[in-house]
Amino acid sequence: MISFLLCLAILIGGYFVYGKIVDNTFGPDDRETPAVRINDGVDYVVMPQWKLFLVQLLNIAGLGPIFGALQGALWGPVVFLWITFGTIFAGGVHDYFSGMMSERNDGGSIAEITGKYLGPVMQNVMRVFSVVLLIMVGTVFAVGPAGLIVTLCKNSGMSGVLTTTLFWLIIILVYYFIATFISIDAVIGKIYPIFGICLIIMAVGVIFGIFTNPAYTIPEIWQHFGSMHPSGTPIWSFMFITVACGAISGFHSTQSPLMARCMKSEKQGHFVFYGAMVCEGIIALIWAAAGCSLYEITGGLNTGLAAALAEGQSAAIYDVCSKTMGGVGIALAMIGVVVCPITSGDTAFRSARLTLADWFKIDQDSYANRLKLCIPVLGVGAFLGIGNALGFINYTVIWRYFSWTNQTLAMIVLWAASMYLFQEKKNYWITAVPATFMSAVSSTYFILAPECLGSLLNSKTAEGATIYNTAVAYPVGVIFAIAMLVLFLHATKKRTAKNA
């Protein structure tokens, strides 16, 4: 428990100390923000700071810090360290700069920002990459909740159309269309703060339940400083990829511009962007602690948690909430596993619309122009979702690549932020260091993961267990990270010479 409390204190302190260093490095000022200057009543709408924070939290969180943290807890309390320091030095920095760079560039989408600082080739790569990723995220966060609602209806004794996935999927997609089309403060700005509060209450309830029940003990890092993963999966770099939103996530960079278009002052960025990421880190820390403390440990391995997750991630959330909070926890769990994915799905589609609008220079202040983009974006999402529900499309294999693409996106955004800081003659090491680190994480995972090159390089034991080829992956990951840093420094020298 001491480890947990120390990490919690470091996270909170990190917001006030390192978060302020990050904020001062960027240098917010009193210039007119896009929300005030453009204010189209649709995407550029001034919102109060507390609402900006809660909407940003729900946009970037959803179920990410819950699912990812529970999966990360399979490695044991060592995951506390990554959640804590990853949030402070990588995730918070990433979210802050993706939001503030957007704010300085008329609320532009992350693809446009990346192109400005890393060049037109990377801009086009990011445009395609972002739209595909966002539609995929939105679709998955429609199919998943639809299936969960069907399960709830069946368990409640209902029958007929209410117990069909297709019915609920259509309902969710209709809501997505409305939320993507109308003004951001009409639906998202009104209901998101409520669900953001629910997400926080659920996390507080979980940790309170653990603290007040003597049967549960949060293990200490120094007692289990190593992998407790039942399958023997290496900590590096699988844990760093798996935790994802609980420490750093490239998906956040697609969401931060939404709030960058709604800020009244640049000085709100520290609280809205860095603060929301720290809050998400705290939520992830709590759920990781739950995963480490509520389940049986056999032979120093988290076998109990592995069994719980094998029943399904939603089932694991339900189990944690019921054990720590009883009936109230069950109600909160249902809100969490159904509503939170939906609130990530609708903003994913909205971000896809805005990315396309920035790409093709289509103003979004008229209904007709929004329809031009909403129809194809939601149309593709509906095709994938309904196709999956009817069984003739299966993108499960494609979704496995999300973990890697998510952190690769974070890596690219951090390099873009580094170039921005260089051009502004500011301390670019504050972003270049985490960019280098994430370059190593992403490249190492690409070589080791079975869905990537691991299927070619790894081997199996006689019992079928995977032997990961770390002898190749680890050095290659380090070399790639160093190469990226060298390329960045070379680019800065070329730009310096050009401007001389």
Task: Describe each region flagged by the PLM.
Residues 99, 210-221, 275-319, 389-393:
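Extracellular/periplasmic helix-exit of transmembrane alpha-helices
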Residues 47-64, 207-215, 224-287, 332-344:
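Hydrophobic, membrane-embedded alpha-helices of multi-pass small-molecule transporters
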Residues 138-156, 167-168, 180, 199-226, ...:
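Hydrophobic alpha-helical segments and their helix-loop junctions in multi-pass secondary transporters
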Residues 1-19, 72-102, 111, 330, ...:
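Extracellular loop-to-transmembrane helix junctions
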Residues 10-66, 268:
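Membrane-interface "cap" regions at the ends of multi-pass membrane proteins
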Residues 10-11, 15, 56, 90-106, ...:
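Helix-loop-helix module between adjacent transmembrane segments
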Residues 7-17, 130, 134-138, 196-214, ...:
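Selective recognition of specific alpha-helical transmembrane segments in multi-pass small-molecule
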Residues 123-127, 162-170, 275-284, 292, ...:
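Loop-to-transmembrane helix boundary motifs in multi-pass membrane proteins
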